[in-house]
């Protein structure tokens, strides 16, 4: 009864008004799983391919009818009759059928939507929550934890139309006793920050991920207004709340230099590493993502030596959720954490393999959304089901972001005493 009986792919809209792929997977039992593929703005060059139509007369070339056709015409016939309980086999059939290294034939957006929908259908068929099914697939049945949220409350870089170079300034409510209270702290800080920015006559418009996107004189000014907001909300920096950055450095890495146009400063690899180390020493920054360009492996190794014992250094564009690249990082002392994005690799099985490899090597794994999202909240279940300990899913506004937080609230309620919240100890180097 767990066998796949029907698969439907369709084109829907994401949070940026661009098309994306949705898949429905039906089982013989009548269970149906539905999932969508997210989409990134700042992307790593080695990510699995997101297939777009390129037809400029339709959605500015961003349609996904080719990916949808791949689901309906190629993937569906190949998967019919297979058990949704055998996630690894289902994913491998799609990967083999595509036959390319980066899923460029069908598109990672097509394969991923089906992969996640299969998992959701299987969970429904087993009459268990998705996070429980994921923990069983992961070989860690019954091992759960609620993630520390990294809440992106000031957006810059590719996620906003402002002059701030660093892409994300985040707060982590590490001092909260549970996820519910962590979320409350984040929401109160978000509203406090709006008041701080308004009082300074700064814009309170939001970027793609729901964080504010004001024009500020420097990256340090962004840190200062966040600290003011945290304190105004009644919390203590470094005890209740810590800071995290996503530099997305590949976006301002030009000809071997790091060009911070918003500040009028240019750095080489070594001096930009020093700049980040100085920020982490001056402010309670305990996590830095993509501090250096995805190709600057020497710079990454140097930064890891400098501050990797006390700051979590997260590889996003660097590793693109790819076990081959992650292994190189582990073997060469590059970074100490990986950002996990389903659509960078394109299937649930490969995502779980990357999380396991990271955790086995003593790296942390941070589960992440993309800047182009939908109401699909699967990453919440992934974070809990793999006991990853950290999640990045934007700010405290925009329903595409809040959907994930709300799902985590539901999961925490369902788990009761089993819903442990690790706080600061979940972050590498703490």
Swiss-Prot record:
Binding site for Mg(2+): 246, 289, 316
GO terms under biological process: glycolytic process
Catalytic class of the enzyme: lyase
Pathway of action: Carbohydrate degradation; glycolysis; pyruvate from D-glyceraldehyde 3-phosphate: step 4/5
Subunit structure: Component of the RNA degradosome, a multiprotein complex involved in RNA processing and mRNA degradation.
Residues where (2R)-2-phosphoglycerate binds: 167, 341, 370-371, 392
The keyword Transit peptide appears for this protein: no
HAMAP family: Enolase
Cofactor section: Mg(2+)
The EC number(s) this enzyme carries: 4.2.1.11
Cofactor binding notes: Binds a second Mg(2+) ion via substrate during catalysis.
Family, similarity comment: Belongs to the enolase family.
Species per Swiss-Prot/TrEMBL record: Pseudoalteromonas atlantica (strain T6c / ATCC BAA-1087)
Cellular component terms per the entry's GO annotation: cell surface; extracellular region; phosphopyruvate hydratase complex
Localisation: Cytoplasm; Secreted; Cell surface
Entry annotated with the keyword Thylakoid: no
Protein name, as recorded: Enolase
A GO MF label: magnesium ion binding
Chief site of localization: cytoplasm
């Amino acid at each position: 009864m767990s066998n796949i009986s029907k698969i439907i792919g369709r084109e829907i809209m994401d949070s940026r008004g661009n098309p994306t792929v949705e898949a429905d997977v039906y089982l013989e039992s009548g269970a149906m799983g539905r999932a969508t593929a997210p989409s990134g703005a700042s992307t790593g060059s080695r990510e699995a391919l997101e297939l777009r139509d390129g037809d400029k007369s339709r959605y500015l070339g961003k349609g996904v009818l080719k990916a949808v056709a791949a689901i309906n015409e190629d993937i569906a016939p190949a998967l019919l009759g297979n058990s949704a309980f055998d996630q690894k086999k289902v994913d491998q059939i799609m990967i083999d059928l595509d036959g390319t290294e980066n899923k460029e034939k069908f598109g990672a957006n097509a394969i991923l939507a089906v992969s996640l929908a299969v998992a959701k259908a299987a969970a429904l068929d087993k009459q268990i929550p998705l996070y429980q099914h994921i923990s069983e697939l992961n070989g860690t049945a019954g091992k759960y934890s609620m993630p520390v949220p990294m809440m992106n409350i000031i957006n810059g870089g590719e996620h906003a139309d402002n002059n701030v170079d660093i892409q994300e300034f985040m707060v982590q409510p590490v001092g909260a006793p549970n996820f519910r209270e962590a979320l409350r702290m984040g929401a109160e800080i978000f509203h406090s920050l709006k008041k701080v920015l308004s009082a300074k006559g700064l814009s309170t418009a939001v970027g793609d991920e729901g964080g504010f996107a004001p024009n500020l004189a420097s990256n340090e000014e962004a840190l200062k207004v966040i600290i003011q907001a945290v304190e105004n909300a009644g919390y203590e920096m470094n005890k209740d709340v810590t800071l995290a950055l996503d530099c997305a450095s590949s976006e301002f890495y030009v000809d071997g230099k790091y060009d911070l146009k918003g500040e009028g400063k240019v750095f080489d690899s070594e001096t930009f590493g020093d700049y980040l180390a100085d920020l982490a020493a001056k402010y309670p920054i305990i996590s830095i993502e993509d501090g250096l360009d995805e190709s600057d492996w020497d710079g990454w190794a140097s930064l890891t030596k400098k501050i990797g014992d006390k700051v979590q250094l997260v590889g996003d564009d660097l590793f693109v959720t790819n076990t081959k690249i992650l292994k190189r990082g582990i073997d060469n002392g590059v970074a100490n954490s990986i950002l996990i994005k389903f659509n960078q690799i394109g299937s649930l099985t490969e995502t779980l393999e990357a999380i396991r490899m990271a955790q086995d090597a003593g790296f942390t794994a941070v589960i992440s959304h993309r800047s182009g999202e939908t109401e699909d909240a699967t990453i919440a279940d992934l974070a809990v089901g793999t006991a990853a300990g950290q999640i990045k899913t934007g700010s405290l506004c925009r329903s595409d972001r809040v959907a994930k937080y709300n799902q985590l609230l539901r999961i925490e309620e369902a788990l009761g005493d089993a819903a442990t919240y690790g706080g600061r100890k979940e972050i590498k180097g703490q």
